[in-house]
Amino acid sequence: MFANADIVISAWDGARLVGVSRALTDYSYCCYLSDLAVDVAYQKHGIGQELIRRTQSIIGEEVSLILMSAPGAMAYYPKIGFALADNAYVIRRKR
């Protein structure tokens, strides 16, 4: 999973992993944020937003950042600057 990622960023509290983001990108047009996970005990402290900010810092302003949200996180992303896309299609995975 991580071996094929272009960008992996982690957040730690001492020796405890509390957050991780994983992205795939061409570094010129788009970056797909495939995973964003923060330990429930550490949510609502800006960790997810910081993981995204660091991803954006790596890809730069000229690269679009896109993602597929988990249903429970749909309300989160607009709060941190994402816009709902009305021009996207998906072929869902079979498993």
Regions found by a protein language model. Name each.
Residues 1-36:
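A conserved beta-strand-loop-helix scaffold within acyl/acetyltransferase catalytic domains
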Residues 14-15, 41-42, 93-95:
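Short loop segments at secondary-structure junctions
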Residues 36-38, 73:
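Hydrophobic adenine-recognition pocket in adenosine-nucleotide-binding enzymes
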Residues 42, 46-51:
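Conserved acetyl-CoA pyrophosphate-binding loop and the N-cap/start of the following alpha-helix
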Residues 61-67, 71-95:
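Conserved active-site alpha-helix within GNAT-family acetyltransferase domains
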